[in-house]
Amino acid sequence: MNCYICYMITHEYKNTYVGITNDFEKRLKQHNSIIKGGAKATHKYNDWKLAFYISGIEDKNSVLSFEWHMHHPNGKRKKDSTSKKYYGVLGRIYGLCEVLNHYKFENKNVKCNMTKECYEYIMKENKELYELLESFIEIFILENM
């Protein structure tokens, strides 16, 4: 059985990309154009790095659903005037909070695994947002990423 994660990568904490994979190291190399197969949306830059990943979601279909909700945290298929609040790392974290607030997990082992760099960025820019995220999900800080 393959273990899938939903991940967010960032370029300089402005541009973000959310996806799923069962082989993150390979997928990141694809996004950074080291090997073929990266998403069209990430080809503009070649220095993407992990911000966080969500683990513990039971199966691929549930991870796909979670990813869809990360792309549409307000539940709407089309972008509207409220979509801009979900831009950048802080916007994606805010969207993650909304998804976690509304999305019902059958598995309570869902965790947010965040890089130390991303953690420090959020604490500097918006400590309250980190505390809000912490109220919805257990967060592990990844020291060596």
Locate predicted features.
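GIY-YIG nuclease catalytic motif and its immediate N-terminal context
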Residues: M1-S65, Y94-M145
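Short arginine-rich
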Residues: I35-T42, W68-L90, Y94
